[in-house]
């Protein structure tokens, strides 16, 4: 009560100062504006929050092409201002967020609206909020909650020449990634006003940089998997060239374990990749408790009943979906035949274009979809084919089951590998002699192949063998006479599509890099073709 009385005393003092100002100055004070940001896809645009306080029937009106959650700020802002110790005169308040042709959504406009109202009423000097972007959601008690999309907003502020950003404390680690912008964290409306008036902020958050990592590295290793040496080599090749791969095998053969360990052999992300991934997760509101720069490559494994908008992105106010959240990492579809046909067929275009375009309310949103697709499935409905002692599925049943994945989608997998059931002797042999490929040795082989690709594609806009165009293949996948005869014979015998032919050559190029070969050999082509046995690998 004492604290509230002091606050009200300050209010009355401010009111008296306000009333003593000449009428011309008072008219100026009744209008104020501050800067904020709105998300548009993965980017942000700077917007201006304008407030006019005038005579008339007391009301609070808002305009500027606003979503429902922005309109709901009326009551949040009014109550938060009162509970922070500030009193507003019973006048007509009009809020406009411009430009009006951009849809405004999210709760990050609460704080800028409140500060603009306080500025218009003389509680703060508008000059002090010049060159500052303001973001934050208000609670009824005046505290400030975190919001999504702070990173792209601060990045856009930097591009626009804005030097300061007033953001929630919980978004501090995220905001400070951007250099040359003074990040001001605040946890209450009162603290924000204190900073604007006095340039002082209390309890500025200074987290340990190690806490900024938003994903927890699990101690998983390919050494945990006994046997499956062929599948491990195929996985290593797939990661080296960012090739899409499918695991087919009975339940318990290690398909899921194999896939979940892929991040352990992927090279660490560059800073630019980390920034791109962090930007995506910021927009999606999935940066976690500490926020900050995402250090680990994404591994997304959506359940098979995922909705179309959650998978591809979209909704009334578009947000990134699973295929975008998996960017620079792995999208793992376990039990792939259980996914809805519209999900599987919808993958075809993003796999080719590496992005997805969504149209909502007359605007076009383009999200990246630069991921490595990893699938896992059983060879038949019961899962035990070709073990006829346990499998009673007919060949027609098997074909029908495999047919849940269309041939155009099959064609987009560079590699397919069987994971056979592991017997007791294999488990004991592997555990006794310790001669099991582990993640560290596999990662070193991947790094050597990646280095070869880095030199090969230096100065080009591609990084991996899987990204080569037809022209790039003619340049980097030249074949000798024997190799040409072999690929020609395979093409004719198996009636390959043009895409299938290019997939074999790209995979062969990666195998050559893994083995340290300058040129593609017949052995490389034969191995690449072995991985393209789709779907014959399951029924022969």
Show the residue positions of the predicted features.
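Single conserved hydrophobic/aromatic residue that forms the stacking wall/gate
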Residues: 1-15, 137
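Short glycine-rich substrate-engagement loop in P-loop NTPases that contacts/grips substrate
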Residues: 302-323
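Basic, amphipathic alpha-helical bundle interface domains used for macromolecular binding and assembly
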Residues: 66-74, 89, 96-106, 318, ...
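Walker B catalytic acidic pair
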Residues: 328, 334-335
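Peripheral, non-AAA+ core regions of ATP-driven protein-machinery
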Residues: 16-246, 253-256, 500-501, 518-540
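The Walker A (P-loop) glycine that initiates the GxxxxGKT/S ATP-binding motif of P-loop NTPases
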Residues: 249, 313, 335
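Walker A/P-loop
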Residues: 247-286
């Amino acid at each position: 009560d004492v604290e509230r009385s002091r606050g009200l005393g300050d209010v009355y003092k401010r009111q008296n100062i306000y009333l003593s100002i000449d009428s011309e100055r008072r008219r100026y004070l009744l209008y104020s504006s501050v800067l904020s940001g709105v998300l548009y896809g993965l980017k942000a645009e700077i917007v201006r929050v304008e407030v006019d306080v005038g005579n008339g029937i007391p009301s609070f009106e808002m305009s500027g092409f606003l979503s429902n959650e922005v309109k709901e700020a009326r009551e949040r802002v009014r109550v938060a201002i009162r509970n922070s110790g500030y009193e507003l005169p019973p006048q007509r308040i009009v809020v406009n967020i411009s430009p009006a042709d951009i849809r405004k959504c999210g709760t990050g406009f609460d704080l800028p609206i409140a500060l603009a109202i306080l500025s218009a009423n003389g509680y703060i000097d508008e000059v002090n909020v010049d060159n500052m972007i303001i973001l934050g959601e208000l609670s009824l008690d005046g505290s400030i909650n975190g919001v999504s999309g702070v990173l792209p907003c601060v990045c856009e502020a930097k591009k626009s020449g804005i030097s300061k950003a007033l953001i929630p404390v919980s978004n501090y680690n995220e905001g400070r990634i951007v250099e040359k912008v003074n990040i001001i964290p605040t946890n209450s409306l009162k603290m924000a006003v204190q900073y604007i008036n006095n340039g002082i902020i209390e309890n500025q958050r200074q987290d340990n940089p190690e806490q900024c990592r938003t994903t927890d590295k699990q101690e998983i290793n390919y050494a945990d998997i006994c046997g499956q040496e062929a599948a491990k080599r195929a996985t290593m090749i797939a990661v080296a060239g960012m090739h899409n791969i499918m695991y087919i095998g009975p339940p318990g053969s290690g398909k899921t374990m194999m896939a979940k360990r892929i991040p352990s052999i992927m090279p660490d992300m560059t800073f630019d990749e980390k920034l791109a991934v962090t930007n995506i997760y910021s927009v999606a509101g999935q940066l976690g408790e500490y926020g900050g720069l995402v250090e680990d490559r994404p591994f997304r494994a959506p359940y098979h009943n995922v909705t179309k908008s959650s998978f591809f992105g979209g909704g009334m106010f578009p947000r990134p979906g699973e295929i975008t959240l998996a960017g620079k990492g792995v999208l793992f579809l376990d039990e792939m035949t259980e996914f809805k046909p519209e999900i599987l067929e919808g993958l075809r275009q993003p796999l080719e274009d590496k992005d997805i375009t969504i149209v909502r309310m007359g605007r076009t949103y383009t999200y990246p979809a630069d991921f490595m697709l990893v699938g896992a499935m059983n060879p038949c409905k019961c899962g035990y084919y070709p073990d006829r002692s346990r499998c009673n599925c007919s060949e027609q049943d098997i074909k029908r089951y495999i047919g849940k994945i269309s041939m155009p989608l099959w064609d987009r997998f560079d590699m397919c590998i069987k994971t056979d059931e592991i017997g007791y002797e294999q488990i004991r042999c592997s555990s006794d002699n310790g001669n099991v490929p582990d993640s560290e040795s596999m990662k070193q082989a991947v790094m050597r192949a990646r280095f070869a690709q880095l030199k090969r594609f230096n100065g080009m806009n591609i990084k991996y063998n899987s990204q080569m165009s037809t022209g790039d293949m003619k340049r980097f996948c030249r074949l000798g006479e024997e190799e040409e005869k072999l690929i020609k014979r395979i093409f004719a015998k198996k009636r390959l599509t043009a895409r299938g032919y290019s997939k074999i050559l790209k995979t062969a190029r990666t195998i050559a890099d893994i083995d340290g070969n300058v040129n593609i050999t017949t052995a490389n082509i034969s191995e690449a073709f072995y991985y393209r046995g789709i779907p014959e690998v399951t029924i022969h």
